[in-house]
A protein has these predicted regions:
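N-terminal secretory signal peptides that target proteins for export/translocation
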Residues: 1-8
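Helical hinge/lid and interdomain linker segments adjacent to catalytic or ligand-binding clefts
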Residues: 30-34, 41-43, 47-126
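A glycine-rich, often tryptophan-bearing local segment used as a flexible ligand/cofactor-contacting loop or short
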Residues: 98-167
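Boundary at the C-terminal end of the N-terminal hydrophobic targeting segment
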Residues: 25-29
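Extracellular ligand-binding/catalytic regions of CAZymes and related secreted enzymes
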Residues: 30-39, 65-68, 83-86, 196-207, ...
Length: 264
């Protein structure tokens, strides 16, 4: 079978599309705080199935290219160092299904309440310390199920104005579709709906996928996407995470946003 060459009109349209996407991402990035000079604590570990090391390999080069000053730790020990935590602008955490000491939890939560930002994804933030309800209060949600395991599903961008999701279209994922217990007051930026194929009683249910909130003075960003590092090959998934990180990094320097929007 011979492949027909693209017409000039088709080629021009394709170029225009990719330029528009590129310009949109650039424009929205300008609406978010810069990472230049920000002190970032990148903490990774916990369950290996979520590929923490590989995810660090994706984020670390980008963070450094953005001008962030990054400390990486494969332990939660820094959380207990009060003086160190006071110097941090942003915590990025991927530490699934782990234990945190009372001293470490207090150090982390105090830092966020006092103005440091925190950002994370999937189980690394949303299923980290199952016994610690104050931590879950800070995050705004907790994983409880992923019906069907690895499946195809769609993510709907519901907030078209927020700089974290502005300009992004709906997109498809082949991964775990998280079902979570979520604070009904978080500012939801993207959602997903369940087919009912794997749990008939939730057919048509809608669940937040991406949200933002505050805890004390600190900005909190969460996305349930990113079961494995390859999930960030989906451009929108990676772009949302990067924008969410930048938003959170402005926690000590930007005005507090109004995020509480009761649904009841």
């Amino acid at each position: 079978m011979k492949t027909r060459p693209l017409s000039l009109r088709t080629s021009v349209l394709m170029i225009a599309f990719f330029l528009t996407v590129s310009m949109s991402a650039s424009t929205n990035a300008e609406d978010l705080p810069s990472l230049k000079g920000k002190k970032v604590l990148l903490v990774y570990g916990g369950w290996k199935g979520h590929e923490p090391e590989q995810c660090v390999g994706i984020l670390l080069p980008w963070l450094k290219a953005e001008g962030a000053v990054v400390d990486t730790f494969s332990t939660l020990a820094p959380y207990a160092d009060q003086k160190y935590m006071e110097s941090i602008d942003l915590v990025i955490q991927i530490f699934t299904m782990s234990k945190i000491t009372a001293e470490q939890e207090k150090g982390l939560l105090t830092a966020i309440r006092n103005g440091a930002g925190i950002a994370g994804w999937h189980g690394g933030l949303g299923d980290a310390f199952r016994e610690n309800t104050e931590y879950q209060f800070m995050v705004g949600g907790q994983w409880v199920a992923h019906p069907g395991g690895i499946i195809d599903y769609e993510v709907t961008v519901t907030d078209k104005k927020d700089p974290v999701t502005k300009g992004l279209a709906n997109f498809k994922m082949h991964s775990e579709q998280y079902y979570m217990h979520v604070d009904p007051n978080v500012k939801v930026l993207a959602t997903t709906a369940y087919s009912g194929k794997h749990a008939s009683w939730i057919e048509g249910a809608t669940m937040p996928v991406v949200w933002k909130k505050t805890y004390g003075k600190g900005r909190v960003f969460y996305t349930s996407l990113g079961h494995v590092a390859a999930d960030f090959n989906v451009p929108q998934a990676l772009e949302i995470l990067k924008r969410g990180i930048r938003w959170s990094a402005g926690s000590k320097y930007e005005p507090t946003e109004q995020w509480v929007k009761p649904v009841y």
